[in-house]
UniProtKB/Swiss-Prot annotation:
It is found in: Cell inner membrane. It is a peripheral membrane protein. The keyword DNA-binding does not apply. GO terms for cellular component: plasma membrane. This is Elongation factor 4. GTP binds at D19, H20, G21, K22, S23, T24, N136, K137, V138, D139. Residues 7-189 form the tr-type G domain.
Amino acid sequence: MTTTPISNVRNFSIVAHIDHGKSTLADRLIQTTGGLQDREMKEQVLDSMDIERERGITIKAQTVRLRYKAKDGKDYILNLMDTPGHVDFAYEVSRCLAACEGALLVVDASQGVEAQTLANVYQAIDNNLEIVPVLNKVDLPAAEPDQVKQQIEDVIGIDASEAIMVSAKTGIGIPDVLEAIVTRLPPPKGDRDATLKALLVDSWYDVYLGVVVLVRVVDGVLKKGDRIRMMGTNAAYDVERVGVFTPKMVNVDELGPGEVGFITAAIKEVADTRVGDTITDDRKPITEMLPGFKPAIPVVFCGLFPVDADDFETLRGAMGKLRLNDASFSFEMETSAALGFGFRCGFLGLLHLEIIQERLSREFNLNLIATAPSVIYKMHLTDGQEIEIHNPIDMPDVVKIAEIEEPWIEATIMTPDDYLGAVLKLCQERRGTQKELTYVGSRAMAKYELPLNEVVFDFYDRLKSVSKGYASFDYHLTDYKAADLVKMQILVNNEPVDALSMLVHRSRAEGRGRAMVEKMKELIPPHMFQIPIQAAIGGKVIARETVRALRKDVTAKCYGGDITRKRKLLEKQKEGKKKMRQFGKVDIPQEAFIAALKVDS
């Protein structure tokens, strides 16, 4: 394979909102440049997980090296980085963008700019990327290219007069996209003779090769047999193979400056290769890392318990396997009196949580219960200590707490005008404060500050339902603020159920508690004695429902006769029930847990 001069290399990524067609566009580019034969083409080539293909989302970043002969007769190498579009994976997006010099901004011509498009475009602009707007789905009858062009200029502030019209599905305009990549995007810069410096873009686990690391070489040359060092973890490895994806893995002799490819080096765990790390030569390392590296920090936590206690070991193995491929997912063992043994898991966000849960049930056939998601709270104690907790069970005694702080986010919500009222009302209900509200054509863009605690529960589902699915939402963490939070417990027959305790804002506690006890009342079957179900904060009960007892008609065999005879039997029954209530155990069915945790606040 002859080395291509650096001026003929182009690294670009595709930035788009979910469902605007970037994976389909990637398919067309691969097909047009002959990366795969027609028989090997399938929908969304780059989305390798079934779940990615089904939900139409990209989770792990992927890359492809395409060879393209341009109209000027030169051969170019185009490295396409397919980035995830969802907010939970924003850090992966930022690393992908750091490895590129340009980006294609794909906007659906029938839907216009959405919230996540904005977030990703701003990241691209921050990384000084050249941006080429592409309007997709122009073949749809609902497409309004001129309005969307105007919208791109108004909202994002980049010139869209030369936006390329394409339909990725039918293949219209694909050659124009390839030409634009070559003519409008800059080549990478890099010094071949300098010391090796490369960016670790992503990594995943392969059963045969160990960890496969995706790299973008900035300076120097990376070849087989080199001894490399990861600067973030300070571990050294010997490179075993170097290659590129065309999307198939193809071995090459070396990767020069500006090139993107993969290496394997007998690395055991993905956790050893942190996304955004800098790779250098072990013999003569560079002194400073590439900017922007930060370890993945979980934001949302929840407990996962197997419905069948015998599945615990299977669950442990399954989580270990997922952890091989996803370093941002963390877990530790936890026990619950109500649910038995399970794990407390940390995720990047709600989509990440859903995906992990779905993969556990789908790939490993596990039946799971998830407890209510929670976030990390900071507790300032009266003795001057500061602790962080994410499990309501670990909360110290109320008298010891001086102040509780919770994380806040800044959310950007784009919605059609008609649903704006409902969306603003939802944000207000969730203790949000409005920062700004702007209009672009018939769409409104609202910026809100919201507590993350209110968002993790079911905010996204509610937002979709109040806006008939049209609103889009994107957020990033800002800081911690003091809050009046209380620990609410659910008591069944005067016994606290640990799996249902949660930290809520005092103003929302009664509503949330009442909804939960009502739901539990419907689902706990009647026992031989009456069962009180209570929601309590500390010693104060804020809501109560009672499941009535089943009782036998003890007076059935008395015909007529004296009332005292009947009374004696009823009193005797009453005594028995009282005794039962002291010693009886209540069986709470799994459905009751699941329903109580799904309660719509």
